[in-house]
């Protein structure tokens, strides 16, 4: 089983399409970070609307690494599953189109082991992609924008999450994203 998993991981990570997803996501995140670095205060003023009249807010402190990561996670909610589906679909269909799937099923390995190895290899890919997103969006945003409390707009108002209570929430968010994509 371990050999099958190694083979599947090799097949996934030798294709340029795999690294294209990493590059697209990195470029997307860097564009968001650049836009918020240049115009973050205006964006935050737009998002919070007329609350400036009722509350005294320092918009420069609201645009921080946690807020940028929150924004990135909400934007990538749609894009990442599409990239994962492309790679995951290619794991089986690419093998079938090349004709090697029939050859593989004729070997003394059960079909369950083959599919399980493909599933686990896809899980490793998803984990690597989410780890890449976490590093690029959270670590780089914290390095560039710093840390402060996170203000989240909800339907019934604003919620302020203190900076010492945020990091574990991001770990759970990435964990739940991993579960959702599997």
What is the predicted role of each segment?
Residues 1-26:
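Aromatic- and glycine-rich beta-strand/loop motifs that create alpha-glucan
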Residues 11-15, 75, 94, 98:
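Membrane-interface junctions
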Residues 26-89, 117-181:
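Secretory targeting signals
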Residues 85-105:
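Transmembrane helix boundary and interhelical loop/hinge segments in multi-pass membrane proteins
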Residues 112-116:
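Alpha-helix N-cap/helix-start motif at helix boundaries, enriched for small hydrophobics
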């Amino acid at each position: 089983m371990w050999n099958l998993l190694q083979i599947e991981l090799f097949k996934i990570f030798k294709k340029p399409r795999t690294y294209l997803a990493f590059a697209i996501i990195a470029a997307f995140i860097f564009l968001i970070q650049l836009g918020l670095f240049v115009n973050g205060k205006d964006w935050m003023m737009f998002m919070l609307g007329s609350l400036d009249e009722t509350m005294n807010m320092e918009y420069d402190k609201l645009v921080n690494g946690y807020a940028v990561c929150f924004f990135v996670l909400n934007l990538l909610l749609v894009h990442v599953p599409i990239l994962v589906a492309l790679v995951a679909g290619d794991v089986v269909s690419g093998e079938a189109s090349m004709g090697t799937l029939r050859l593989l099923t004729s070997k003394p390995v059960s079909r369950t082991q083959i599919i399980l190895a493909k599933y686990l290899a896809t899980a490793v890919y998803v984990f690597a992609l989410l780890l890449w997103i976490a590093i690029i969006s959270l670590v780089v945003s914290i390095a560039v924008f710093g840390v402060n409390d996170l203000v989240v707009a909800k339907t019934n108002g604003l919620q302020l999450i203190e900076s010492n209570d945020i990091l574990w929430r991001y770990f759970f968010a990435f964990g739940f994203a991993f579960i959702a994509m599997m």
